[in-house]
Each structure stands twice: as C-alpha cells, then as structure tokens.
C-alpha cells in the first residue's frame, strides 16, 4: 500500500524538480544566497528556541505530567498486587 501511494508522490516531486524554478523564483546570484544563509539559520534557531520554550512552559503549566505519573503508579500497583496474589 505504501509503495502504491509513494510512487505518485515521487513522480510529482521529480516533475517539480525537473521543471526548474519559476521565473519569479529564479535567484539572481548564488553569492547573495550564500550571504543570507547565516541570517536565515539564526532566524530559524531563534524561532525554534521560542517554540520549544513555549511548548515546555505549556507542558509545565498543564496537569498532564501529574496525571501520567498517577496513572503509571496505579498501573504499577495493580500489576504488583496481581503478582502477589498469583505467587502467594
């Protein structure tokens, strides 16, 4: 099933790559592109850092960790009780 779905996607991607850039997308000079790479990487890093911090803060503020910890504790205690009754 995956092969059937991946082949059309591969054909579309190859056709897009072989078609080349549109006239509006064509870069004038490669050197200007290389000069912008550090700025783009810094911007990407800052954006990634902000999103990661926001996600961590959201997790800290939510009650999901406490609920997960309680669920694991309860499940562990149930398994422990079953083992005690089975081997006693």
UniProtKB/Swiss-Prot annotation:
Q: Which gene encodes it?
A: APOC1
Q: Which GO terms describe its molecular function?
A: fatty acid binding; phospholipase inhibitor activity
InterPro entries on file: ApoC-1_sf, ApoC-I
The UniProt function text for this chain reads: Inhibitor of lipoprotein binding to the low density lipoprotein (LDL) receptor, LDL receptor-related protein, and very low density lipoprotein (VLDL) receptor. Associates with high density lipoproteins (HDL) and the triacylglycerol-rich lipoproteins in the plasma and makes up about 10% of the protein of the VLDL and 2% of that of HDL. Appears to interfere directly with fatty acid uptake and is also the major plasma inhibitor of cholesteryl ester transfer protein (CETP). Binds free fatty acids and reduces their intracellular esterification.
Identify this protein by name: Apolipoprotein C-I
Query: Which GO CC annotations does the UniProt entry carry?
Result: high-density lipoprotein particle; very-low-density lipoprotein particle
Which of UniProt's keywords are assigned here? Answer: Lipid transport, Secreted, Signal, Transport, VLDL
The membrane spanning regions, by residue number, are none
Q: Where this protein primarily resides, as one coarse class?
A: secreted
Tell me which Pfam families the record gives.
Answer: ApoC-I
Q: Name one GO biological process term.
A: negative regulation of very-low-density lipoprotein particle clearance
Q: Which residues form the signal peptide?
A: 1-26
Subcellular location(s): the record lists: Secreted
Protein family membership: Belongs to the apolipoprotein C1 family.
What lineage, starting at the top, does this entry show?
Eukaryota, Metazoa, Chordata, Craniata, Vertebrata
């Amino acid at each position: 099933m995956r092969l059937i779905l991946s082949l059309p996607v591969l054909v579309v991607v190859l056709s897009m790559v072989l078609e080349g850039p549109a006239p509006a997308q064509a870069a004038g000079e490669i050197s200007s592109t290389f000069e912008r790479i550090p700025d783009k990487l810094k911007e990407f890093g800052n954006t990634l850092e902000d999103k990661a911090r926001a996600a961590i803060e959201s997790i800290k503020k939510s009650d999901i960790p406490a609920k997960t910890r309680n669920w694991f504790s309860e499940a562990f205690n149930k398994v422990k009780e079953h083992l005690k009754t089975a081997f006693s």
